[in-house]
Each structure stands twice: as C-alpha cells, then as structure tokens.
Amino acid sequence: MRQNGLSLSISIKHIIMINNYSLSDISSQVRRDIVRMVNMAASGHPGGSLSSTDILTVLFFSEMNHDPKVWRRDGKGKDMFFLSAGHLSPVFYSVLARSGYFPVSELASFRKQGSRLQGHPSVERGLPGVHVASGSLGQGLSVACGAAITKRLSGEENFVYVLCGDGESEEGQIWEAAMFAAHNKLSRLIAITDWNGQQIDGPTDSVMSLGDLEAKWKAFGWEVIVADGHDLDAISAAYKQAKAGSQNGKPKMILMKTHMGMNVDFMQGTHHWHGKAPNADQTANALSQLKETIGDF
C-alpha cells in the first residue's frame, strides 16, 4: 500500500502539508488528539475511538473519494461517510480536522458549551464533514441505506460508508437495515464494524453474544470481508475488495478485528475505558506511548 500516496480527492494545498506523513504517522497523531480531547473535556469515549483510529485513517486519507474544500451536506458527487456509533466522535473529529474540513485548533473545543464539536456529531452548527446527527445506537446503518438509495436514483456511482460498533450490533434496527440493504441490492453500501469485543457493560460475548458474526451477515445476504483493523495494509485491501464488488448486487460488511483502547497499554482490551476520561497523570502516560508526528493542536 502506498502509505505516502494519500487521496488525491483532498485539496492540493492540504496534500502538500499532509503528504510528508505516512498513514502510520497520521494514525499516531489522531490517537494523541483523542486522548487530549477527552482529557481536556473531562468527558468522552476514548476506548472505541482508539480502536477505530486505523480504520478511519485509511478510509479518509487513502480510500474514500472526498474533498473537504467542496464539501456538501447532501454528499452529491462524492463518497459519503456516516458515524453510526456516534460516541466515537473524538476519532471522527480528529480525522475530519486532519483532513482539512475545519481548523485543527478547533479540536480543543470538544464538548464545550457552544462548540460545533459536541459529544455526538450534530448538524445544528453546520460542522463540515457531518451529513447527519448521530442518533441512538443502531440508527446509522438505516441512514446510510437511505443515502445509498438516493445516490442510485440520482445516477451517482459513489460509495456510502458507515461505521458501526459490535456492541451496537445488538440493536434490532441494525438487522432491519441489513435486510433492507440486501433486498434492495445496495452494492455500493460499505458498512464497517469496529469488532473490538467490548461495550460499556463488559465483553460483548458476556453482555449479549453476537454468535458467529461473519456467518450472520452472510445469512442476511451481505458480502462479508474480515480484516485486521490495526494492519494498515489489510485495511486498505479490505476497502479495495469491497469497492471491487460494486456490481455484484450485495451490500458489503467489513468486520474489522480491533482492540479497545489500542496502543495505550492501560486502556487496551478492557471495557473500563469505553466512556471514561483520563486524568492528568493518565494522559501524560498515554501520550508518552503515542508518537507526536504532525503536531498537537
């Protein structure tokens, strides 16, 4: 994978700045952003944001057709991304800012009163990159289905991406949307599950087992791709495979195997950091494990 050959859909000025960094560099900086944002706000969800960092870094900086400088809320003429697991807003905001949708300095306003960067993404204050407010868990896949149908009816051949959580997949609306997408042959819909095995109350297998998740999605009529959600090459290959099947009549589900709190040793692999802000000492510890590459906000 050409880790320095970042998406040409991003504005030329921004490419000149960001192209000096590999996807690994960007991913490390995004993780630092997440830790600092949640610490500064004394609130937020670091665990799942850290587990999905590599997934969104590859998508926004390598695989998705988007342009921050000509962004439209209706997504016309470009790929669209929806964050169904809205509590993962720290990673979403960081990736948007680092992509050039809004100033990186604005990350410091996360969860502040009057900020455009609320705990769950909203459209009230017109934050570029956010097409729709995140609702209750389970709703985003349905929204993405609607966007995919709209693009088909409009004659567009762009892709629609949506990120869901594995805990979120316990919601019934996910499976209603799964049936809808398969029935309507939404082959340009690419859903991603951050499969970290943890949710707010504990391991997903203990709270409510999803069983054989791969077999389940296949049984619902989806093409299923399983990948290591922390291997940048594997993530890129998964996206490419999903896009290559755009004419096969099947929606795509990429099951990304990840670790909650990835790359921060005391957060990694435990549900205790699902929605907990690190204190000053914990933040310093976490940042010592994450290389500053592009520069902190």
Task: Locate each region found by the language model.
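Short, Lys/Arg-enriched N-terminal segments with co-localized hydrophobic residues
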Residues: N4-I16
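Cofactor-binding active-site loop characterized by glycine-rich and histidine/acidic residues
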Residues: I34-V38, S49-H183
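Generic beta-sheet signal
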Residues: D79-F81, N158-V162, L189, N248-M256
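Thiamine diphosphate
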Residues: L127-G129, A133-S136, L141-G245
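N-terminal capping segment at the start of a domain
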Residues: S27-S43, D194-N196
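Glycine/aspartate-rich loop-and-adjacent alpha/beta segment that forms the canonical ThDP
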Residues: L232, A238-F297
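Glycine-rich beta-alpha junction loops
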Residues: D54, H87-L88, N196-G197, K257-G261
